[in-house]
Structure formats: structure tokens, C-alpha cells
Amino acid sequence: MASIERTAYPQFKRNPVVRELVAAYTPTDAEVAFVAEYTRQPAHRLTLTILLKTFQRLGYFPMLDEVPPAVVRHIRSALKLRVQVKPANLANASRYRYYRRIRQFLQVRAYSDGGLKIAARAVYEAAAVMDNPADLINVAIEQLVRDRVELPAFSTLDRLTRRIRTP
């Protein structure tokens, strides 16, 4: 099993500095308009913006409880919401609707929409010249990003590289 730290798989930084927060998590006017179009309540505006900005940064949708508090505070402040506003607990239907709208807005395809074929082809071709699992995972990540496909869970990429490397 490859270690996630040895790959390019995106993760949150433990203690992001203000400059990083501003650069990666401040919503643009177009993003604020997008969020306002689909939400009314402050908690839902915060939630949709968190999902949007973290997806842009990571390439996949993290669980809301995995988002560092500093990121939540920064986005809440950027939206000019009160400190008491917390991310909404979304029902599955709402969460998946938000995911679909974010993908449409960013023009990114879901991994389930052909991502496995793209990643498998990239890993298969790269396996002819390299055999380090972390390198093969990086090849898959690079190809998925290039083709504007959402990244799957790290374990999915790890299993894929093990399956392709094993004759």
C-alpha cells in the first residue's frame, strides 16, 4: 500500500497560513453569485461555498467535518456571515445536488463518469516504465486533473495501481 504522504494526492494543510487561506479559499464574485443562486439560508451558503472552494483546492469533495476550522472561519468571514453561522448538516439528496451543481459550475466530470478508464489507462501505460506505487498514483492523478475528472478516494487509486502492477 502506498503512503498518501508520498504521493501528489491533495490534502488539507494542518495549519494553513493567512496567505494560503486568502489565495485558495476566498470566493470570487462569480462564485458568490453562483452560491447565492442556489441557496437562501446563511448556513447553506457557507456549506456550498466550503464545498466549492475545497473541491477547487483538492479535486474531490471532503467530508465537512474534515475541513480545517481555519478554512471554515476564513470562508465565513469572506462571505460576511456572523460567527454563529455553522455549516449546515446536509441530507444526502442535498449534498449530492450541491456536488452536481459544483461539477457543472467548474466543468468537471464525476469519477463515476469515465474516471476509472482514464486512470487505469494512464497507470497501465506508466507501469511499463515505472513500478513504484506512489509514482503510478501520481500519474493517475495528473491524468485525471488534465482531463477535468473528479479525484476518487485515495484508496481507490491505491487499489487500482496494485491491481494493474500485479500480473
Where in this protein do the model-derived segments appear?
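Long amphipathic alpha-helical coiled-coil/heptad-repeat bundle
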Residues: A2-P167
